[in-house]
From Swiss-Prot:
Annotated EC: 4.1.1.37
Gene name of the record: hemE
Keywords associated with the record: Cytoplasm, Decarboxylase, Lyase, Porphyrin biosynthesis
Protein name as catalogued: Uroporphyrinogen decarboxylase
GO-annotated cellular components: cytosol
Annotated localization: Cytoplasm
SUPFAM superfamilies: UROD/MetE-like
Length: 354
């Protein structure tokens, strides 16, 4: 069932689709999170996993930065490993550590234990989306999921990793096992995003947080086909699709291949290490760009923030002149917990003025 809203005034959807927005659209990754006192108050009473599987908490946390900052898009509050939990993986999110997998996936026999995502386990997510689309007015709602490679890294390493050595060793040395795992995780990602799209999200973003650890050749050989299958499977919903990774300057062209060419608006996220103008030259024609203020800038005081925000907006305009179909202002990664919420509010207001 398609319950998609019509949001002709959304600057986010306009920029993503290559239309001229009435103002530069802005939202920030991890805008719903530890930078907000209201979020910290809720989380003091609930674990991360509890929050991610409670419809009312998902709704409230997703709405908090919209109320406070006036951003142009809300991103569904969740965690990258939620679909793994919904597929039966025994895991927890440990404070100050991150996701921890009870039984890491290391062998072909382990891969065979990865089950399809069970829709009923993420019913609270769908319920929350219904509540959010009723509450958000003209503000777009972005659904999200982790890309298969990043999910695979968590499963193989057993948690966050600096070098992803076990992941890359399986990828390079046990390619049949690797491809079986990636195929299973691609199915999980597709199904989790289908749940969100069927419930009414206005756009989706796929996070490949750890893809920057790969060479371009390895990304193309072992990751790109699986990521492309995610976007191809979901293109029929007709919503803008964004592909984002960290440290992916050399991969931007390949990542744009995964997300574009499917007949729907395609957006490529850019981190702060690459200018938007350079990114415009690297991605496929027909892609919009999203980014790319360094999150640390928001800790450096308003004069620094103001200069940097103006610079990103100007770089975005140059990128559009250079061929990008649009620009969505964002950070190059997530809001840091120590960020002053008032600075974020002021930065959003400044973007809207420029």
């Amino acid at each position: 069932m398609n319950t998609r809203r019509e949001l002709p005034e959304s600057p986010y959807l306009a920029a993503a689709a290559g239309r001229k927005p009435h103002r530069v659209p802005v939202w920030m990754m991890r805008q719903a999170g530890r930078s907000l006192p209201e979020y910290r108050e809720l989380r003091a009473k609930n674990t991360m996993m509890q929050a991610c599987f409670d419809a009312d908490l998902i709704t409230e946390i997703t709405l908090q930065p919209v109320r406070r900052h006036g951003v142009d898009a809300a991103i569904l509050f969740s965690d990258i490993v939620v679909p793994l939990r919904a597929a039966g993986i025994d895991l927890d999110i440990v404070p100050d550590v991150g996701p921890v997998i009870a039984h890491p996936i290391r062998t072909a026999a382990d891969v065979a234990t990865v089950s399809p995502l069970r829709r009923e386990t993420v019913a609270p997510v769908a319920t929350a989306i219904g509540q959010l689309t009723a509450a958000l007015g003209d503000v777009a709602l972005i659904g999200f999921a982790g890309a298969p490679f990043t999910l695979a890294s968590y499963l193989i390493e057993g948690g966050p990793s600096r070098n992803h050595e076990r992941t890359k060793a399986m990828m390079l040395g046990e390619t049949e096992t690797w491809n079986a795992l990636m195929a299973a995780l691609t199915d999980v990602t597709i199904e989790f995003l289908r749940v969100q799209l069927d419930a009414g999200v206005d756009a989706i973003q796929v996070f490949d947080s750890w893809a920057g650890t790969l060479s371009l050749a390895d990304y193309r050989a072992y990751v790109l086909p699986h990521s492309a299958r995610v976007f191809e499977a979901l293109a029929g919903y007709g919503v803008p699709m964004t592909h984002f990774g960290v440290g992916t300057a050399e991969l931007l062209g390949a990542m744009s291949e995964a997300v574009s060419g499917h007949g729907v608006p395609a957006v490529v996220g850019v981190d702060w290490r690459t200018s938007l103008t350079d990114a415009a030259a690297r991605v496929r024609p027909g892609c919009a760009l999203q980014g790319n203020l360094d999150p640390v800038v928001l800790l450096a005081g308003w004069p620094v923030v103001e200069r940097a925000v103006r610079a990103v907006v100007e770089d975005g305009r140059r990128a559009v002149d250079a061929g990008a179909t649009g620009h969505v202002f964002n950070l190059g990664h997530g809001v840091l917990p120590a960020t002053d919420p008032a600075i974020i509010t002021d930065a959003v207001a400044l973007v809207h003025q420029l």
